[in-house]
Amino acid sequence: MRHEENYLDLNNLPDDFSKDGNKQALEEGSSSGQRKKKGSKEGKDESGKVYECRFCSLKFCKSQALGGHMNRHRQERETETLNQARQLVYRNDTITPPGISPFGYHHTTDPTIYRSVYSSPMIYPGSSSTNLVPQPPMPPPPPPYPYSSNQYSPHNHFNDYYLNPSFRGSRSISPSPNLPTTTTVDYMADSPVEPGYTCVGAPIGPTGFPIRGPSIVRAPLEPPQGRDGDASRQRLDHSLRFPINRFQDHHSL
């Protein structure tokens, strides 16, 4: 009885103790393995939850996969809002004139909306049809310089007159061939020159060349002072009776 009650006595071990110990260890290991399997099955049942996306209704087994998918949706929505804001900015920019661009964007709209009326004709590729801008009208010529009875024309020259059969019925006096006619006087029948000639430059003789004679300096011609033009006709007749030689100074040299 003493030996049976003392389990710590190694000398009185039974013969089948190793077998019994192995059986007991196997039983304990199998029980623990069954418990682990049961725990894993319960964990699988717990992890079998399905996570659904709020945007596209996709289902995920793990919350991490759903989080990455939701981040992509957020990025897409952010880029969409940015694109909408850019479109609004472009629309507001097209309303303002091209010279007052606040953001420095290049205008892609039709530039003919803000073109000037006096600009040069241009062809714009963005417009529906090629529009040619008309040139501004030329300013009218200045009116003739009004000469009074005591004032003389600044274009009057001396000894620079010649005859030219260009105008008939009237005679026009011009200081030089390069300047326009400044005074036109209708001569009567008592004029020494036949009607239908223009008096411009030095007088021409019967040979067709300028008449050579003493150079006489006279006062410039004045416009008509009366209704009938007597004073102007007398001065012009007096100047035409005396020949003028504008080449005397050259021959004297």
Curated annotation (Swiss-Prot):
Q: Does the keyword Methyltransferase feature in the UniProt annotation?
A: no
What are the GO cellular component annotations? nucleus
Q: Tell me where in or outside the cell this protein is found.
A: Nucleus
Region Disordered, annotated ranges: 1-46
Q: Quote the InterPro entries the UniProt record gives.
A: JAGGED/SL1-like (IPR045320), Znf_C2H2_sf (IPR036236), Znf_C2H2_type (IPR013087)
The UniProt induction remark is: Stimulated by GATA18/HAN.
Which stretches does UniProt call biased (Basic and acidic residues)?
A: 16-26
GO molecular function list? DNA-binding transcription factor activity; zinc ion binding
Q: What happens when the gene is disrupted?
A: Lateral organs with serrated margins. Irregular shape of floral organs. The double mutant han-2 jag-3 exhibits reduced petal numbers, more serrated sepals and narrower petals.
**What are the record keywords, sorted?**
Developmental protein, Differentiation, Metal-binding, Nucleus, Zinc, Zinc-finger
GO BP terms: namely: abaxial cell fate specification; anther development; carpel development; flower development; leaf morphogenesis; regulation of flower development; specification of floral organ identity; stamen development
Q: Which tissues carry this protein?
A: Expressed in the emerging leaf, sepal, petal, stamen and carpel primordia. Not expressed in the apical shoot meristem (SAM).
- Zn fingers (C2H2-type): where? 51-73
What is noted besides the main data? Answer: Plants overexpressing JAG form bract-like organs on the inflorescence.
Q: Which PANTHER family match?
A: ZINC FINGER PROTEIN JAGGED
Q: What is the name attached to this protein's record?
A: Zinc finger protein JAGGED
Q: What is the lineage of its organism?
A: Eukaryota, Viridiplantae, Streptophyta, Embryophyta, Tracheophyta
